Regions:
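Domain-scale signature associated with acetyltransferase and cell-envelope carbohydrate enzymes
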Residues: 1-148, 173-174, 208, 217-224
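Glycine-rich hexapeptide-repeat left-handed beta-helix
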Residues: 133-224
Length: 224
């Protein structure tokens, strides 16, 4: 380690050595130790280094496949039980309080989740993927975003809980930026390079290189 570079970095960011070491321990060393434990248990599917946050639960980890340098933040719930599992590319970050669930009923397994290389998912995101949820490479997904890859059927002829669900899936292309608290509904396909403004509700497809905002989301302009 080049200590002069570390010192210069600390000074440039107004950090003292105690703050730096605390951050390094809580965000790096301790999650890495937790990750090594699960990586050894699933060595053929979870690649080292893998970082697992405090009080994070990974259920059915035999259905989880990761690339290198994946990070899952504190207090997250990851239920991987599904037909195709949960597949994370290299350097995927899933921040604190994430909720990923694919299957809620073992008699009707969900499809799975695929997240591409170097994609960042912010804190308190919900990824519900009864149908397949696919997110591309190098995406930035803000805090509190919800993906809902399933929809309830309804009519006036019977009770809601008796009417079942439909499943189409959600696809997000590469290099997309999805703002805080966006909701993306089942059946939506989002092209490469799309920007979606905070709080939008996406109910239909968004073509590549578009900027979309609002509820329901509408195309505002092209991304240049």
């Amino acid at each position: 380690m080049n200590f002069s570079k570390v010192k210069n970095k600390l000074q440039a960011n107004n950090l003292n050595i105690k703050d730096y070491l605390t951050y390094l321990t809580r965000k790096g060393v301790t999650p890495l130790m937790r990750g090594i434990y699960i990586s050894l248990y699933r060595f053929n599917k979870i690649k080292i280094p893998f970082f697992k946050g405090k009080n994070t639960r990974i259920i059915h980890s035999n259905h989880l496949i990761t690339g290198r340098f994946c990070y899952i933040g504190d207090f997250s719930y990851i239920n991987c039980l599904s037909k195709k599992g949960v597949k994370l590319g290299d350097r995927v970050t899933i921040r604190e309080f994430a909720w990923l669930q694919i299957t809620s009923d073992t008699s009707n397994l969900g499809e799975g989740i695929v997240i591409g290389n170097e994609t960042y998912i912010g804190p308190r995101c919900n990824l519900g993927a009864a149908a397949l949820l696919s997110i591309g490479d190098k995406c930035q997904i803000g805090a509190g975003v919800s993906f809902i890859a399933e929809n309830h059927s309804f009519s006036a002829n019977s009770a809601i809980f008796e009417q079942g669900v439909t499943r189409k899936g959600i696809t997000v292309g590469n290099d997309c930026w999805i703002g805080n608290n966006v909701i993306i509904l089942d059946g939506v396909n989002i092209g490469d390079g799309v920007v979606i403004g905070a709080g939008a509700v996406v109910t239909k497809d968004i073509p590549a290189n578009s900027v979309a905002v609002g509820n329901p989301a509408r195309i505002l302009k092209e991304r240049h």
